[in-house]
Design a protein with these regions (language model features):
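C-terminal transmembrane module of eukaryotic multi-pass membrane proteins
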Residues: 212-236
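Non-catalytic, topology-defining segments of multipass membrane proteins
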Residues: 1-173, 177, 186, 194-221
Length: 236
């Protein structure tokens, strides 16, 4: 049960620990602390982005001003997260201390870094296009949403709690399909060209796979009423 918390401590103190994959054999609840921290971080980023870079009041008309804002925000967050971890793990003054923690002692090549960063950036553009489409549907009234969180408090809380599990199921399902036949050969194999994974590798995917991956947002966004909390663009 303490495995995730112990690893968080080891990362903070640069304790190399042991090179084992023992976490994979543990019970599902052993990963809850790490999962909670990860999900809470993503939720915080989402709320911050929504509060300051979500111009729903302008989204009824497709125009470059607000669409470029969405793209710039997603690219900036991506480079901050992945680029920040990349710098910390491979270019900062702590690299030597963390080398002993690597399962693969070899560092990724510059060619792989460029490959992963390029396809991740393409992914940020696809992510932005999907978000822009959803925003436009909300703003034009073609998809239902409500502004008052307390209008349906139980539904609002349940929806926020359900979405991470839906995302995990969606990822599990599509990942199984992507490892089959033609989809693997022509689509998913690009992701597996990251032979020595780094922070940029997770989002380094073929555009088709990226589109399928972010399609997880379509089910909750298009088929369930959404709560849009007032932000700096809409205060009523």
């Amino acid at each position: 049960m303490v495995f995730p918390l112990l690893n968080i401590y080891r990362i903070a103190t640069f304790d190399p620990g042991e090179k084992t994959l023992s976490a994979a054999s543990g019970a599902w609840w052993q990963d809850l602390p790490a999962r909670y921290i990860r999900t809470t971080t993503y939720l915080g980023l989402a709320l911050f982005s929504y509060a300051y870079t979500f111009p729903l009041d302008r989204a009824a008309v497709l125009s470059y001003d607000w669409m470029l804002l969405i793209l710039a925000r997603n690219v900036a967050i991506g480079y901050l997260l992945y680029g920040g971890w990349h710098h910390f793990l491979y270019q900062s003054r702590y690299v030597r201390k963390m080398t002993s923690r690597k399962f693969n002692p070899k560092f990724p090549s510059q060619k792989q870094w460029d490959h992963d960063r390029f396809w991740s950036t393409v992914g940020f553009c696809i992510q932005s296009a999907i978000e822009i489409g959803i925003m436009h549907l909300w703003a034009t009234g073609k998809v239902e949403y409500y502004l008052d969180f307390w209008q349906y408090p139980l539904w609002s809380v349940a929806w926020m709690a359900w979405v991470p599990y839906w995302h995990d199921f969606h990822f599990w399902f599509i990942h199984r399909q992507l490892h089959m036949g033609v989809l693997y050969k022509w689509v998913h194999s690009l992701h597996h060209k990251s032979f020595n994974p780094g922070p940029w590798s997770g989002m380094s995917m073929h555009p088709v796979e990226t589109t399928i991956y972010f399609s997880s947002a379509l089910v909750p966004a298009l088929f369930f009423p959404q709560v849009n909390i007032p932000n700096s663009y809409c205060t009523e």
